[in-house]
Amino acid sequence: MEPDFIVIGSGPAGCAVASRLSEDPRHHVLLLEAGPGQRQGLLGSNAALAALVYGTRPSAYNWGFDSLPDPGLNGRISYNPLGRGLGGGTTLNTLMYMRGNPLDYDGWAQAGNPGWGWSDVLPYFKKSENNQTFSAPGDPYHGQGGPVWVEELRTDNPWHATLRQACQEAGWPYNPDLNGAAQDGFRPTQVMMKGGERHHAGQAYILPHLGQRPNLQLQCDSPVTRVLFEGQRAVGVEVLQGGTKRQIRARKEVIVSSGGLLSAKLLQLSGVGDGALLQRMGLPTVAHLPAVGQHLQDHVDVILGHHIPGDPHLVGISPTGALNLWRAMRRWRQERRGMCTTNFAEVTGFMRLATNAPVPDIQYEFVVALAMDHGRDVYAKHGLSTHVLLLHPKSRGSVQIASPRWEDAPAIDYRYFSHPDDLATMVEGVRRVLQVYDTPTMRSRVKADLRTAHCRSDEDYAQFCRNVAGTNYHPTSSCRMGPDAATSVVDARLRVHGLQGLRVIDSSIFPTIPGGNTTAPSYMVGEKGAALLREDWQ
């Protein structure tokens, strides 16, 4: 049967859209995923192993794109792990459940997007969530009974208490709920895991209903090469299955949910984008929308490293570390607890660099291993890595097709630090977190600063940042929402400007990047986008 809706991409937003649409038995929904289906065994369920094995190199489960050389990074290329397969990025990520700041969303509404303020989107955050800590009925900030399982880490790691003590010695407050009344402060990370196992979007929204809902269909290993149009109406897709291209028509709408980089690429390959770019690529222009692929934002990330010798609670490459890992794997198999339940970024927090700042400027992630360069550069030591994330970058980049072939990677140009305020804020953010390592609690444990010991001046720190910074895997806003077709791609109902039957529903529509990890906001956008579709097709 011809589907009513075709959803392209099974990341957090796409899975939410497909699942919620199919709750209505009148809607026949086809979810298309370019990558494989469900992974089995340890690599599918163990959070740490999945990130290490699949996140460090391109594979069937990781698009693994490289950026263009970036002047802001002294000409370096930034590697971009990107989940491929059922669940999308939730199969590779660090599982952190963070929403951002309420003022982020009020800013979306004030920019001309009615219905996207904090009070509008909070119900959709709650609808997606099944929080095991904040589980009281009627909790004003958290949901219970939603598809996305949120729980505390099960690592039983004493470093949670140690870092809490060090942060408090540095004057940084403990915050029991970073997604609650206030964002400032630190706590152990809440994670999207279920019983000590990775809980990805496909498990949350799709797999429980396959076979139970005859109107929901999933097809994996099915990359969409372009959206099909008749005039200005999207009528279906061209998809590659088993080495053969075929066309599938949609009776109602096509929904692009391919993420912060690939949604813009698919629109451009389909003739929707800047007309001059499409002409250079030899593609016909269906709709001239110059904002497609523009306004790319990301949380640029600088990683610090501190050597803490022989600590059995830190993941490390050493004989002791190997023995600890073997013991931890045995415990994980028996109890689903211990080191092998780690998401690595076990403690996180948010800080304003100026007391009068309206929202936090920096997010810190304390990682229980010395891992740099996306896990591809691992020290043969034990220690802590500290990620310093710029929450509200002023720099803007772009993502564009590099050829008319769907197989070719897009040209990703982040233009990190192209706005001078970003580098100055990052330098101050690095200096601030080093205060934590200069507390009595940390001085007694840390043997060496492995990354910034040579830095003395702001210029030293700025050069260090340029030499090591890269992505924190949060590309957004390349199909941003807004009222003006000259500067945005979709309207407040997520309809592509000037076209019919086509919406974009994922992190690419964020008008500005939220101040926190982007998976929870992507689930929210999927939930709200599905509600808009159901309203329009009652």
Predicted regions and their residues:
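N-terminal redox-cofactor-binding region of secreted/periplasmic oxidoreductases
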Residues: M1-Q538
